[in-house]
Amino acid sequence: MSKLGYDIDEVDITVGTSYDATGEAMSAGSIDLGWLPGGTYALYSDDVDVILTATRNGLSNDSTNPADWNGEANATKKDGPQVTYYRSLIYATPSEYGKELAAKVNAGEKLTWEDLDKATWAVQKTSSSAGYIYPSMWLMANYDGKKISDLSNVMPIDSGYGTAFSYAAAESVDIIVCYADGRNDYEASWMLPTDQQDETGKQGMGRSDSIWNEMNVIGVTEGIYNDTVAISKESQYYTPEIVAALQDCFINIIGTDEGKAIFDVYSHTGYAKATDADYDGARAALQAVAE
């Protein structure tokens, strides 16, 4: 920011316990700037303004046919073109019933509502785009308006996708939902002994076959607009000039090798200036799920 004419003495950086917690803190004005998924931004957009949208490296697979994602031969790679959206995937776990669901999908059979309702689902908080909102919209589009809240056996998870994959590995649930392709991030830990950790610190899950064979995609959602960099409307610091400088600053930083390394934790590879209207679709998704 100093190169753009603004001297900032001190920045306090914290890690939110959840996306909702970050959104609530920004709404209250106790956080000035934060990174929020599109769905969380839409939920808090009365009190928060978007300034940037992330771009990411796309995946090698963007098929809407779930069977195309399954098996070692279809293992997803992070080598696609730059994209402004991602998808959520609905995965059948290696539980006995999860395997039944996967076998039907891989044979080209469409799952019925009864098939899905019999399963035990693990889902994220209701503000999570990939972990709740878009999977619920997928159900609505394919099963006569039914959604996650209509399912008989749903296990909400407050502690993130790692917990969902650990439940899957333990065969405690039959279906989990996650961003595409979450299997990349848990591939190394999936087959490690449970008393070991992978190089990123993820605990081993003790499975004996690869995650690509055991975690089968049974549903693919519509595209989800990428994460935001957003600012609190309650903050005392922002003027249009400072916002413009922040936008340029983040775009410049991520354009460097050092910046790319910093933002790799989010899988962000670039930023583009954004407006609130870009997330009208995310608001519509929230409304559809809430009704």
Question: Where do the model's predicted regions map?
Answer:
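An extracytoplasmic/periplasmic, membrane-proximal ligand-sensing/linker region
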Residues: 142, 237-291
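Short helix-initiation/N-cap motifs at beta->coil->alpha
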Residues: 6-7, 11-24, 37, 147-166
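A conserved helix-loop-strand patch within extracytoplasmic ligand-binding domains
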Residues: 55-129
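Pocket-lining segment of extracytoplasmic ligand-binding domains
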Residues: 117-237
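Extracytoplasmic/secreted proteins, especially bacterial periplasmic and envelope-associated proteins
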Residues: 21, 25, 30, 39-43, ...
